[in-house]
From Swiss-Prot:
Coiled coil feature spans: none
GO cellular component entries: ribonucleoprotein complex; ribosome
Recorded superkingdom: Bacteria
Name of protein: Large ribosomal subunit protein uL24
InterPro entries registered for this protein in UniProt: KOW, Rib_uL2_dom2, Ribosomal_uL24, Ribosomal_uL24_CS, Ribosomal_uL24_KOW, Translation_prot_SH3-like_sf
Gene that produces this protein: rplX
Species for this entry: Campylobacter concisus (strain 13826)
Region listing for Disordered, in residue ranges: 52-78
Similarity-based family: Belongs to the universal ribosomal protein uL24 family.
Keyword rRNA-binding: yes
Function: One of two assembly initiator proteins, it binds directly to the 5'-end of the 23S rRNA, where it nucleates assembly of the 50S subunit.
Quaternary structure (record): Part of the 50S ribosomal subunit.
């Protein structure tokens, strides 16, 4: 996907047009240009396990947004 120009960028509001979160809207947190994916706030949330560390001595779980293919989002005007 090198040298491909995308119509969305970080901070844009987009609507999910395909997949489990179809119809939801959110702000783009990151664009993964090499993979052709975006991370949208509040969409495709997965629970990830965290290993114990100095920051989190007990470890645990955290909800994290996962990447969505850029073809599955549409920019919302406004």
């Amino acid at each position: 996907m090198a040298n491909v120009k995308f119509k969305v960028k970080k901070g844009d509001t987009v609507k999910i047009i395909a997949g489990d979160d179809k119809g939801k809207t959110g702000k783009i947190l990151a664009v993964l240009a090499k993979k052709g994916q975006v991370i949208v706030e509040g969409c495709k949330v997965a629970k990830k396990a965290i290993k114990p560390s100095e920051k989190t001595p007990n470890g645990g779980h955290v909800n994290k947004e996962m990447p969505i293919d850029i073809s599955n989002v549409a920019k919302v005007e406004g």
